[in-house]
Every structure is written in C-alpha cells, then in structure tokens.
A protein has these predicted regions:
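Cation-handling catalytic/transport regions enriched in His/Asp/Glu
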Residues: 1-284
Length: 284
C-alpha cells in the first residue's frame, strides 16, 4: 500500500501501479515504486536462478538445432536476419542524445534535482491531466479509428457490445493488458482500466490485436491463422498512431496538446528506446 497527502492508505497492486506513478505527488511515486520493487528484491536469488535457467534452456535448444546462437534461433522463425537486430541496436544507440535531451526536459519541467525511475511516468503537463470513463474511452477510440473504415468500426463496436472485454481490475486478476482467443471464437481482451490517457490508448492497442485476430481467423484455415509476434504489434501500434494523430489534430487547448505530446514522447521512450535496451541486454 501507499499513502496519500492526508495519510489515507491506497492499495498498491500490479493493476494500479502505473496509475499511481502518474500521480502529481512525488512522495506517492517514490513510495509506490519502492514498495513494489522491494517485494521483488526479496526474491532476487530466485529470480536470478530462473533467468539463468531460461538462458541455459535457450542455448541448449539452439545448439541442438545447429544454430550458432539462441538469438539466431529466435530470429530465424520470423526469417529476420541478425543484421537487422544489430542495426536496430546501433541506430537506437546513435539516437541516445535525443533520449538524454528528453530526460533533461522532463527533469526541468518537473523541477527536480535528480530524475529517478519513478519520475518517468508522471505527466510533465499536470494541468491537462484528466480522468476518462470507459464509455468516454470507447467513444474516443471509435472516433480516432474512423480512417480504418466502416467494417472495422463495426467490428470494434461488436467487441464493445458483446462482452469481448474484461475491463476493470479485480482481486486475483493478472496485471497489464492482453488480447487472446481461440480459432472459431471471437477474441477476448483483458484490461485493468483506471481511466488514464494511457488506458484509453491501451484499449485502442488491444482492440487492434483482437480485430487482427478476428480477420486472420476469418480468412485463414486453422493451420495458418496464427501470426508471429514480429508482425503482431503492427496492428496495435497502428491504432495508437491513428488515435494520437486524431487527438492532436482536434485539440484546441495548448495545455492539452502539450499533455498529448508528452504522452507521445513517453510512448517513444517505452516502445523504441526501452525495448531496444532489453534487446541489447539479452545480446550481451
């Protein structure tokens, strides 16, 4: 749990962790971050052993199938040359000055002497921060995805109307957001909706996955209906790009537009720089 300015206890869960990190009260940010990761630290040896075992397993299977490395084994399933992986890491590293510039701007606008991990999610433009109901989120997503056409919007509405989505956090429910399904049945979406702007984008993102799955199942046999993770994120991030474009185009308020640009910049940090850092960590 964490405590607000009045000392009231707020439950800390995997589902509401990111929402708490968007709070303007820095004490709440710090407490939420430290309380969550202190639990993981208690199991550091177990987590290290599990990670080590996973690496050994990947190496074993790669050698058994005559690959030169587990990386080559992983990429070959998508027919992606290792040079693409290397070029991604190298190109992103060349762009690190842009990330550092963004971090400096965030530090300046937040007015902090040191920038910590728990400072990365809080909006830099507090005045435009707002809460969305799920009904508002659905309307925003439908309007933003209008360029996808009537058929696509019809499927989107079908998902909204026919219980494709488990919306809110609940006891025992896993964190994050996912889309999943089986052949012959419509997909299902898991959300942990708390009414943030990020939650609105998450709805658009996960419905992108679900409608991709719906179309794939409709047009392919069971054997060929699945798709690789390498292409899976195209459908979802396309929806996010359309949504941010719509919101920026129609925003009439400078503060709101700055808030949206803040979100867009943070999505670049998380999607491009952060994921490539993971890739480089695994490579080394």
């Amino acid at each position: 749990a964490v405590h607000d300015a009045e000392g009231k206890e707020i439950p800390l869960t995997h589902g509401n962790y990111i929402a708490l990190l968007e709070n303007q009260n820095r004490d709440i940010l710090k407490e939420a971050f430290e309380n969550l990761y202190s639990v993981y630290k208690q199991f550091s040896n177990t987590l290290s052993a599990a990670f080590g075992a996973n690496v050994k397993q990947a190496v074993f299977y790669a050698k058994a199938r005559n690959y030169t490395s587990s990386r080559q084994s992983s990429l070959s399933g998508n027919e992606v040359p290792e040079s693409v992986y290397d070029n991604l890491v190298a190109s992103v590293r060349k762009s690190l000055p842009l990330l550092h510039r963004y971090a400096s701007l965030r530090k300046k606008l937040l007015g902090v002497e040191e920038l910590h991990m728990y400072d990365l999610y809080v909006p830099m433009v507090a005045e435009a921060d707002r809460h969305y109901t799920f009904e508002e989120a659905k309307d925003i997503v439908k309007t933003g995805l209008a360029p996808m056409g009537e058929e696509y919007l019809g499927l989107l509405q079908e998902g909204f109307d026919n219980r494709w989505i488990d919306i809110y956090e609940n006891e025992g429910k896993r964190s994050g957001a996912y889309s999943w399904g089986v052949y012959g049945c419509h997909p299902y979406v898991l959300l942990n909706f708390h009414g943030t702007l990020n939650d609105v984008f998450t709805l658009a993102h996960e419905m992108g996955h679900s409608i991709h799955t719906w179309y794939s199942n409709k047009n392919q046999s069971y054997t060929y209906s699945g798709y690789k993770i390498f292409v899976a994120e195209v459908a979802s991030t396309c929806n996010e790009a359309l949504l941010i474009r719509h919101l920026l185009k129609n925003s009439k308020d400078k503060q709101e537009k700055a808030y949206l640009l803040n979100y867009f910049l943070e999505s670049f940090r998380g999607t491009l720089f952060r994921q490539t850092m993971f890739a480089e960590f695994e490579q080394k």
